[in-house]
Amino acid sequence: MNRSRAVTGKIDRRGFLGLVGIGIAGGAWPGCVRVDGGSAALNNGRVEPPAGWLQPSPEFSLAPFWFWNDALSEKEIARQLDDFKAHGVYGFVIHPRAGLPRDIGWMSEPMIRFMRFAIEQAAKRDMWVVLYDEGMYPSGSSSGQVVAENAAFRTRGLFRIDLDTAKPGSTQHGIRIGDDGEPLPDDGQNLIAIVRRKKNGHRIAVVDRAIREGYSVIRGLHFVEDDPPRRDNHREVPENAPPGGDILNPDSVACFIRLVYQRYYDEFKEHFGKTVKAIFTDEPSFLAKRGERGAVPGTTGILEHVNSYLGYDFRPYLPALWYSDEPDAERYRRDYQRALQSRLEKTFYEQISKWCREHGVALTGHPAAPDDIGHLRHFQIPGQDIVWRYIEPGKPSALEGAQSTQAKCASSAMIHLGRRRNSNEYCGAYGHNFTFEEMKWLTNWLIVRGCNLLYPHAFYYSVRGPRIDERPPDVGPNSSWWDEYRPFADSVRRLCWLNTDSRHLCELAILGLNDHLPWRAAKVCFQNQRDFNYLEARHLCEDTEVNRNGIRIAGMHYRALIVEAEPPEKAKPALDVLEKAGRLIRWNEQMDDSELLGRIDRLVPADVRIQPESPDVRVRHILKNGADYYIVFNEGQDNLEFELETSVKGKRILLDPQISRHQILAPAAPLLLKPHELRVIMIAEK
């Protein structure tokens, strides 16, 4: 494939403006899409961007995690809020974090008092707040309070014992073996089944029990050592580790909701739906952190649910959860995982989503896995997270692997579920070597994939002692780029405004499962500017119109569907209709890129064409208030110069999000993009 021309050296801005023309100086959350912000205006015959672009609302601001990680004071909270606002940041997530003194415990009166002060101060400043539902994470235990209220709500797991090798009178995984070689479960331990392995005929006992103390914990809010110094190696210092809750148990989750969500409402209800926009739940995980060896996620009565969900008796296949040499072990593990995810939807996400809907706030945050699109149907603001350098500029991870699907996962869910916003928590644990350029690249990587609410991880209340090394870096007031932050924050507001209350113009979809989104065909589409959305398979049997012309859902019309993963049975009737109409593209590893693109182009004419070709250019086309916008991002490391032909014709206005500058783009003028640069082309006077 021919790359677009690489322009060596730094691009001169005057030369750039000469190529493109003359420079001109320049609400409600939960629920369905609305339209506001105005359309492009004529000023003395000149087309200008709408007011929503020039002066975007604070509602589209970055909303950083604000790590409350040291002794708090009202004076310092107010000072930091003023600093946020002065730098263009109008929203924040109150995130209690490791380093808090013990007298500010999770949901304690002092913590609630400081939260109330921060919320009231935000209201006075026309800022907005997201509350965080755990101390610290993953969500579901209220910092151990769920288990403290009822020990039966501790995380549970399944354990296996090979009865042919276990010695009589011994203890295996906490389960006693009788003199006759049979298991003797204690109180709180339940024998699920004794089945024979298909591989060698051994008898396997499967028992469910609570995870032992010290395992399946969450990260806590207080350092183990009182006021520890920073370590010489800059490693994190130990914090307390409260026990995780059983998020597969609906009663445990109901307790969690009462202790956290209802408490928030009781304390701050006058601000719900106003200053308090949402509550953030963070990657609820079956076994929380530090899982006990040999444990498989489960809970009391889980086998009955698994059998009902799968439609067959799973009991004979239980050994496959531990032994990979059992016949079709991977298949049965996938089936069990799908059943667990279904259970989690019912016990956790559905309960919390219903509570949020009834109390006027949005459920925001993200599930545990990057392609868990199924759980996002329960979020009023579907979201995902980029942490631990899972995605990096110049690395294959931007296009390959499960993590590469996460931005499209959330934005596709937003579209198909009729939501208004989708979010991403990003930059967390990228390390002290993280740069402002990397942060901008990640932002643009998300924006061009449809994200419109960004939660930077994080702004640190304090960097005293070891706090500076807790999942670094600080990407706000304690960063080296804070003085340069305002133009960046303003650009994010413009781009999030653009991606909100707009229609994504795209006629290609890639089929996904509730817990798996394929990336290989997606990579080809990205590199050839064929935009797409992920369509979760169950939509095909729930809320789509499928006929010989394609798929219609939530205002979208997909004329082609790429199928890479094996679809579920319920989706096959709809897929048969599409296949007979010639609108199904079955991708496999033997299909080369040109064949895939040829099949796409026969069904969906290319919306944009780039000459010379460039695999580093990403394009998103949206319609907002009657105007067409093309978001164009150079995801690569080279300066690029190329001609961009769009299917929509008219006067082209080039918008610079950083400086609110716009220029007329001459019809034959090439587009020049520096590495990691993003521009927006508005089509006016069509």
Locations of the language-model features?
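N-terminal secretory signal peptides and thylakoid transit peptides that target proteins
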Residues: 2-24
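Carbohydrate-binding surfaces of carbohydrate-active enzymes
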Residues: 62-63, 75-78, 91-92, 106-135, ...
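Acidic/aromatic-lined carbohydrate-recognition and catalytic surfaces
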Residues: 96-254
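N-terminal hydrophobic targeting/anchoring segments and the immediately downstream early-domain regions
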Residues: 42, 47-49, 61, 95
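C-terminal segment of N-terminal export signals and the immediately downstream linker at the start
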Residues: 9, 31-47, 630
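An active-site-proximal structural segment forming one wall of the substrate-binding cleft
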Residues: 253-275
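Acidic (Asp/Glu)-rich catalytic clusters
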Residues: 54, 84-86, 411-417
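Mature N-terminal segment immediately following signal peptide/propeptide cleavage
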Residues: 49-80
